[in-house]
Structure formats: C-alpha cells, structure tokens
Design a protein with these regions (language model features):
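Short hydrophobic/aromatic-enriched beta-strand-loop microsegments
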Residues: 23-27, 47-51, 143-148, 201-206
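C-terminal domain-boundary segment and adjacent tail
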Residues: 115-128, 183-257, 261-273
Length: 274
C-alpha cells in the first residue's frame, strides 16, 4: 500500500492522479483543494483518507482543525467530525505530524473512539517511536496499521531509490509493507518511473480499500465494486505474487502481501520534525 499525504494545498497535487488508482490520497481538511481532490478521487474509484492534523513536539503549525494534547474529548470529537465534512468520502484517517499528540493516551482514545463510530480505519504515520496509536486502535477494535517506510523526506533521486528498494526488501521479507510519501513532483515522477518494476519482482500494488475491506465505511463505499471483481480476485489468490497492500501500515504510500508469508509489520524510523 502506498499513501500520499498532505494533499489539498497545492495545484500541483493533482499530478498525483497520473499514478495508479491503487495509490491512496490522504487529504488535509479545510484546504483549498480538499473537496475537489476528494470528488475526483471518488469519481475514479480511488480510496481517500483524512490526513488529520495533530500536535507535533516541535510546535510546528498544524493547519486547520489540529488536535492538541490539552484538548478535552469533546473538542477532539468535534474537530474530527468537522474535518470529515471537508473530505466526506474518506474511508480512513492517518495523522499529519502528531509526534506529541499520538504519544498520549486520553486524546488518542477520544480520537479513535470517534474513528470507530464513523466506521473508519486508522493508519499510524509513526512520527514518533512513542506513539500509542495502533496499540489503542487494536484495543478498541479499530481496523489499523502502521507506516513502515517514509519514501521521500529527502527528494534526492538516490534517496528515493534507496527507500524504494528498502520498501521492496521489507515486502519480500515480511509479506507486506506500508509506505508514506507526498505529492512532490519529484516523488510523482519517481513513482511513475519505478512502479512498473514491481511486477517484475513479484510485487503488486494494492489499495487500502482492499486491505481494509472489513472496515464498515470501506465495505459500504467499495463493496459493490469489490463484489463485481470477486471472481477475478479469487483467481489471483492462486498466483504466487506478493501483493502490495496495507496491513500493519497502516494495517503512502503502502502494504505488500505475499501468498507465501505474512509477517508482523516492521516499523522503521520517524519523520523529522513531525
């Protein structure tokens, strides 16, 4: 599974639509292009997520509707509901920044209870090793996963290739990988060039809608389409290819599933200043 974060501010973000529809867009709430991107994604059958702003340890500005560590549960619920109104077709949530917020229990419990009420899934972007996101999500019964690789916190071609290869190694070792990237022109161009190579290595890009098919809102929004292609998917089960889907990552930019093995998601690193 590959998730692209931070969509909604820049006109250049629409270039991400040139990528396969299995790539998930995570859209920032109340941004100038949020509704436009969400609507187009829905028309194309592409799953979208809400990229929910949360407080960082650095104190960096979160943007509209950010969640802070001093908020009461009611305020957290209110902000999430308001954020969802700007991306109404979102089927899941991941954190934008959040190295402070995701590390504290009460706020995350309030957030994830509302995520569950709305039938969404949660992907922990893991901007801190101290995050309690997936731990609490699992306890509350929220479908969840965790990011394993950040693709592009440096935009040099050599670094992008290094992370892309790292992604493939994890997928082959564990049977899946969850990757997060961003709609930078450099990232979009890199993915357009390198995604075709996955099939040659027995890797297949898979949408979060397929990985989280058990999440209520995913089932409601994508169930009909999935049923129409069920016979094809059943045939694919016999294939020995590794499927790039989103499990523990989010349990980008992505998860890869192997017909031969399913491992526990390997969690690596954090994004600087988030």
């Amino acid at each position: 599974i590959i998730i692209l974060d931070d969509l909604g501010y820049r006109p250049s973000d629409v270039a991400a639509f040139s990528l396969p529809k299995e790539i998930t867009f995570s859209i920032l709430p109340q941004t100038p292009l949020a509704s436009k991107i969400a609507l187009r994604a829905e028309q194309e059958g592409r799953a979208v997520m809400l990229h929910m702003p949360m407080q960082a340890q650095s104190g960096k500005d979160m943007g509209p509707l950010g969640l802070t560590t001093d908020m009461f549960a009611g305020a957290i619920t209110y902000n999430l509901r308001k954020a969802m109104k700007s991306v109404p077709n979102a089927v899941g949530v991941n954190n934008h920044m959040g190295s402070a917020f995701t590390g504290q229990q009460k706020g995350m419990e309030a957030l994830l209870k509302e995520v569950k009420r709305q039938g969404l899934f949660f992907v922990d972007s893991r901007t801190t090793v101290l995050t309690k996101g997936e731990e609490i999500a699992q306890r509350l019964g929220v479908p969840s996963a965790s990011r394993q690789v950040f693709l592009d916190h440096k935009l040099e071609p050599a670094f992008l290739l290094k992370q892309f290869n790292h992604m493939k190694r994890i997928a082959k070792k564990n049977g899946h990988v969850v990757v997060i990237g961003h709609p930078h022109p450099e990232t979009v161009d890199f993915l357009k060039t390198h995604l075709p190579s996955l099939e040659k290595e027995g890797l297949t890009l898979t949408s979060v809608a397929d990985y989280f098919s058990h999440a209520p809102k995913v089932a409601k929004q994508f169930g009909k389409e999935r049923n129409q292609t069920a016979s094809l998917n059943n045939a694919d089960v016999k294939d020995s290819k590794v499927s790039m889907t989103e499990e523990n990552a989010l349990h980008s930019s992505g998860l890869m599933h192997s017909s031969a093995e399913k491992g526990v998601a390997e969690r690596l690193g954090t994004a600087p200043n988030e």
